[in-house]
Amino acid sequence: MNLKRLPISFFVLLCLSSLSVLAQNDKPATATNDEKAEKIIQSVIEAIGGSTYLNVRSVIGRGLFTVYKDGQSGIPSTFVDYIVYPDRERTEFKGQEGKIIQTNTGDTGWLYDGASKSLKDMTKMQVEDFKRSIRSSVDYLLRGEWRKEGAKLSYVGRREAGLAKRNETVRLIYPDGYTVEFEFGAKDYLPMKILYKRKNADGEELAEEDRMAQHVKIEGVTVPFVIDHYTTSAQTSRINYQSIQFNSPIADTLFARPASIKAVK
């Protein structure tokens, strides 16, 4: 369920080792803006499932992941994504070059590359990327985890979202300056966009955007089945879910680092 986040494995495939930075636009929030933003959050929670959504503790998603370059789509890879809240995730990819597995658990993680037959611990930067992906997720916003970090919530206003459509926009600013904006349909309150900025390996500031579509209700929870990622207005990837399961048992062993390459399953 990508309300949680775009799995950081997708960003590894795109070679996005980066540092997120403060977005600089729009006016500062006021107390009134905060109240408006809080009401929007409550409306979104109700729209996507209310208590049923809030009671989701684990997610298993299956589908296709496609990289885009210069406006052209590549050959899709199949994926299985396992999430256990609040901070465990394992994503498995199968493509032309073999299998890739990336697993994160809090402050640790490991990566298996079937093509090169390598099994490595994640670098500190990769772990930090994973943590930032959580902080920029709709789930982190709706479940109120940002409050524990002392982030500031504000109402930005309405934005154009196509013919006769508008999105309500709220913003989170974390104490370290990391800024994320979330757009929700003004009529149905479904998640539509996530916007933030990052710096690439060359120190260049890039605008990132996740666009959500094809919302489907499953087991009482409404989720987007398509998530398109854009960098500086150019599409770089698409996630297309084929199935999503909530609260199915997920073994702890899935997240444990294998003792050797031969032990990878």
Write out the residue ranges for each language-model feature.
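Flexible, processing/modification-adjacent segments and terminal tails
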Residues: 25-39, 46, 108-178, 186, ...
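Positively charged n-region of N-terminal signal peptides that target proteins for export
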Residues: 1-5, 24
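Gly/Pro-enriched, hydrophobic low-complexity segments
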Residues: 23, 98, 161-261
